Amino acid sequence: SRGAKSYMEPTLEKDEHGEVIRSGIYTYGETVHIFVERKNYKGVFLPGFQKWSSSYETEPTGLKYIDHMVGNVGWNEMNKWVKFYEDVMGFVNFLSFDDKQINTEYSALMSKVMSNGNGRIKFPINEPAEGKKKSQIEEYLDFYEGPGVQHIAVATDDIISTVTKLRSRGIEFLSTPPDEYYKAVPFR
């Protein structure tokens, strides 16, 4: 366990397509990581799941894979969780941002991006930093009453096309800031 607290002991699950072993550990807040060993499984997902066939064809949206998952933690907790990912998961800190790099006139945050080494799995960990007002991290921690996953980012080769296709399926998005916001970005 390398110091991690167990959420789920290794459990063997089987069906006619083979077997998987699932286990899990606790991380920050109520966040858990579930591990699935599928090397002896040929089914569509996990035992008990069946492939679903639609009676209509849909156009692909362009979503490709999960790019990263961001975790928000409390004041002075980021380095503790960086060490956790290093010690428990063997991850490396391959990118860091301090409050001088991620800030506005009123708020700031700090972030360290943890990765499995080849960049396929990325977990940025954010913590609040001092500012004139509460940072988005503090607002998150207050609203959700503690640490947790802020967002999961999905990769696409064409964001305009993907958003258009997702909107046509009823997915709602936040409004984009006005052009003045983007013009001011280089000066921040």
Please annotate each region the language model reported.
Residues V82, F143-Y144:
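Extended non-catalytic domains of envelope/secretory-pathway proteins
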Residues R2-V73, E77, K83, L95-K132, ...:
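Vicinal oxygen chelate
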Residues G148-I159:
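C-terminal, well-structured subdomains that either form a transmembrane helix-short loop-helix hairpin
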Residues K64-Y65, E145-V149:
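Short glycine-enriched loop/turn motifs at secondary-structure junctions
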Residues Y85-F91, G146:
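Long hydrophobic segments that form regular secondary structure
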Residues K133-E138:
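A short, acidic/glycine-rich surface segment
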